[in-house]
Structure formats: C-alpha cells, structure tokens
C-alpha cells in the first residue's frame, strides 16, 4: 500500500455522502411536514368535534391546511428538496377538496 491507497481508504465513500445529503435534503423537511400536519390535525379535530360541519368550518379547516402545507413547502424549498413541488400541488388539492366536499 502506498500513500495514495491509504488516503483513498481513509476518505469516506461517495455512497455515504450521498446518503447524508439525501437525509438532510429530503427527510428533514418531511419530518417538519409531519409535525406540522400532526399538530394541525389535532387542533382541527378538536375544533370540529361535536359540531355540525358548516361551510365556514370547512373554510377554516381548508385555510389551516393550506397554511401548514405552504409552510412545509417553504421549508422544503429552503432545504433545496425537489419535493416542494409535490407539496405545493398537494396543498392545492387538499384546499379544493376541503372547500367543495
């Protein structure tokens, strides 16, 4: 073994750095998104439980969902994750479903 082989052995392999990069860019925003949705879900169901759902309640729920998804989308965009596009699309879908059904 010469010096180059030893240095190559001591350096981290590219798969490890790609794995860390993937975790930082994708998993962290998804974790934040999960926390946002978990907190929002419990708050929404506490608010609506025991009441009849009117269009105003659906509008409030849709607005809260939309804000949570937009916040998660911003977090994903800042983290340079490609999933922010999908989060934005899902936010629009959830908003339309909550308003029309």
Curated annotation (Swiss-Prot):
Q: How does it sit in the membrane?
A: Multi-pass membrane protein
The principal localisation class reads endoplasmic reticulum
Record's GO cellular component terms: endoplasmic reticulum; membrane
Chain ranges passing through the membrane: 20-40, 59-79, 81-101
The molecule here is called Uncharacterized protein YGL204C
Q: What Pfam families does its record include? A: YGL204C
UniProt keywords (A-Z) are: Endoplasmic reticulum, Membrane, Transmembrane, Transmembrane helix
Record localization: Endoplasmic reticulum; Membrane
């Amino acid at each position: 073994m010469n010096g180059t082989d030893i240095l190559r052995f001591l350096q981290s392999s590219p798969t490890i750095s790609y794995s860390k990069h993937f975790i930082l860019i994708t998993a962290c925003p998804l974790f934040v998104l999960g926390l946002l949705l978990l907190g929002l879900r419990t708050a929404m169901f506490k608010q609506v439980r025991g009441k009849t759902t009117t269009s105003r309640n659906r509008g409030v729920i849709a607005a809260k969902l939309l804000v949570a998804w937009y916040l998660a989308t911003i977090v994903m965009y800042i983290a340079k994750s490609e999933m922010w596009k999908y989060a934005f699309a899902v936010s629009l879908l959830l908003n339309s479903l909550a308003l029309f059904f």
